[in-house]
């Protein structure tokens, strides 16, 4: 082969490798609970992420490059979350959708911020997460400081109980919400008889039930997740208590109904709106159902919106810092509607709703 032919061949090879590089997948870490007591919320997250990525890639991906999900399990455990965050760093991934629980998201976010990795959490609601001046942390859900007052307002204006107990699981998410509700109720001069914590993972709540009965409690707000809430409901009803219960989106899971059975009927919950009921989202709902998955979970939609937000940013830059700046300065159309963020990375104008939970695992607007 002559020199000219060799040069032409080399050029073709270089072009081929260049095109291969352009077609490389963009890896996105999706981190949540795949194991442990709240793995059902991880199921919601991964359902939303997988559908979002499938839809984004079907429409051309990011400038011709496809998104690729890399799943990580932190079990909503802070120590595991740190290990996962370090694994994400070692794997060279620059974008994270997750984590879910506030207690695991916060320590992981320290690592991501230090390493220049963008994190968009679809579920962590603790205000402390974005109150530390970090630049690379955003969320597609609201805050405890939004959800707590929503619950308190409904309790004061609609339920009007006489004797209230506030119970929490002593974790960042649950206790934070419980305190936010307590603050709102105190402002309304409600009679909060006691504020106390239980141990996450506990299954025998006979002592708590006896206390509710002794104190003539007619309303209980619980800050925490569905495994304990389900047991408390079941045991309270078995003891003959007619007490009204309320909890956050952390209890709004079909597994709650599996635990509590008919005792779950009438539970009040605060959570994001039912995005699966939005007409424009029907094609996504149908696609998820076709895979025998459940589209009703709140985190399905906040995760889908997180991927849409990342997509919008990646269409501008592949630099995590530039993506964060873009999102904080622009509105993004998502399955949740248009999303805008403040300088801290919190959504502007996010609203929680109040719903009646039913024994069949569905939720309807509370009256």
Curated annotation (Swiss-Prot):
Signal peptide start-end: 1-23
Location within or outside the cell: Periplasm
Pfam families: Peripla_BP_6
Key words of the record: Amino-acid transport, Disulfide bond, Periplasm, Signal, Transport
Major site of localization recorded for this protein: periplasm
Disulfide bonds, paired cysteine numbers: 76-101
Any one GO biological process: isoleucine transport
Recorded GO CC terms: ATP-binding cassette (ABC) transporter complex, substrate-binding subunit-containing; membrane; outer membrane-bounded periplasmic space
CDD domains: PBP1_ABC_LIVBP-like
Record-linked Gene3D superfamilies: 3.40.50.2300
Function as written in the Swiss-Prot or TrEMBL entry: This protein is a component of the leucine, isoleucine, valine, (threonine) transport system, which is one of the two periplasmic binding protein-dependent transport systems of the high-affinity transport of the branched-chain amino acids.
Similarity comment: family membership: Belongs to the leucine-binding protein family.
UniProt protein name: Leu/Ile/Val-binding protein
């Amino acid at each position: 082969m002559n020199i000219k032919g060799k040069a032409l061949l080399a050029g073709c090879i270089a072009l081929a490798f260049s095109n291969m590089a352009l077609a490389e997948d963009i890896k996105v870490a999706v981190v949540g609970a795949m194991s442990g007591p709240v793995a059902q919320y991880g199921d919601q997250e991964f359902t939303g992420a997988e559908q979002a990525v499938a839809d984004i890639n079907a429409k051309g991906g990011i400038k011709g490059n496809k998104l690729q999900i890399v799943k990580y399990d932190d079990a909503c455990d802070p120590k595991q979350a740190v290990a996962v965050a370090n694994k994400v760093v070692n794997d060279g991934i620059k974008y994270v959708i997750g984590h879910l629980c506030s207690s695991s998201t916060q320590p992981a976010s320290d690592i991501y911020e230090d390493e220049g990795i963008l994190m968009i959490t679809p579920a962590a609601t603790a205000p402390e997460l974005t109150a530390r001046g970090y630049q690379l942390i955003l969320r597609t859900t609201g805050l405890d400081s939004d959800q707590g007052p929503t619950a308190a307002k409904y309790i004061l204006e609609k339920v009007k109980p006489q004797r209230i107990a506030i119970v929490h699981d002593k974790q960042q998410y649950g206790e934070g919400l419980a305190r936010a509700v307590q603050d709102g109720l105190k402002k309304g001069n409600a009679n909060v008889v006691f504020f106390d914590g239980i141990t996450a993972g506990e299954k025998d709540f006979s002592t708590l039930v006896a206390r509710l009965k002794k104190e003539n409690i007619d309303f209980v707000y619980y800050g925490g997740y569905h495994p304990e809430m389900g047991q408390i409901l079941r045991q309270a009803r078995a003891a003959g208590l007619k007490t009204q219960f309320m909890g956050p989106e952390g209890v709004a899971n079909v597994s709650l109904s599996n635990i509590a059975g008919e005792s779950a009927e009438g539970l009040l919950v605060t959570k994001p709106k039912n995005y699966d009921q939005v007409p424009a989202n029907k094609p996504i709902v149908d696609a998820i159902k076709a895979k025998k998955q459940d589209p009703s979970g709140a985190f399905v939609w906040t995760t889908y919106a997180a991927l849409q937000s990342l997509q919008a940013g990646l269409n501008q830059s592949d630099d995590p810092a530039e993506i964060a700046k873009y999102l904080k300065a622009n509105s993004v159309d998502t399955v949740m509607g248009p999303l805008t963020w403040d300088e801290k990375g919190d959504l502007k104008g996010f609203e929680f709703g109040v719903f009646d939970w039913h024994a069949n695992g569905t939720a309807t607007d509370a009256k």
